[in-house]
Amino acid sequence: MKKIFLKIVLLLILANVGLGDVAQIIGDYYSIDKGKVYYRNKILEGVNPKTAELIGFSLLKDDKNVYYMGKKIKDVKIKNFEKLGQNYWKNENKIYYRDKKIENADIMSFKVLNEDYAKDKNHVYSGNEVIDPSPLLGKIKNPETFEFLPNGIIYATLYGKDKYNIYYINNTMLNCFDSYYFIYEVKGINKDKVEVLNKWFIKDDKNIYFKGEILESADYNTFEVLPNGDGKDKNRSYEYLPKDEWRWF
């Protein structure tokens, strides 16, 4: 009886949907159905279904244009297109993050770090914006050699290194619309032995650091990070650290 029921269901499906009518899901709300490319339930007029492909988050290209969230990106015509990584792409010697052009990016040294960060010989980028626009916010000494530490991207907190330094980088909201990256060199740390413990604590082979500053009172051998993110050693727990317990070299 069960087999007969399944056969009836299958026949009903085939009767209502031809084999050639099954929609092809591209991803991120893009699909192809009956020779048309769709974003959600809207037909994207003029998109070539034979060359349409997803190249990043909600980014679609065919042989002529690039689309973001179903809208054609203005002033972009496919010429010498190259996908650089998830969300980053190059066209006509210009580099883009999603639908935004990265102004003044150095094409020869540009390298994607992950889906939201990239670098060239001059800057590190978050999306299409540099993270170090002003020396007042801190600078990465050698962006071309910059890389994130393992487990070094934790929400708005970043840990990275170049050939000179280890960096603690914090993205801080200044108001409802603006945020800035504050970049701090972690002074005195052994950059070949550094380990990220969580967004607040890192360590090397000798010391524990809190938000990029050495934690003088911590007992290195017994220090551990608790499940709630706080620190603890044999002497005390570290739920809140006043400024006088930090030390800059």
Model segments located where?
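Classical Sec-dependent N-terminal signal peptides that target proteins to the secretory pathway
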Residues: M1-D21
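Non-catalytic tandem-repeat scaffold regions and their flanking low-complexity/translocation tails
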Residues: L19-F249
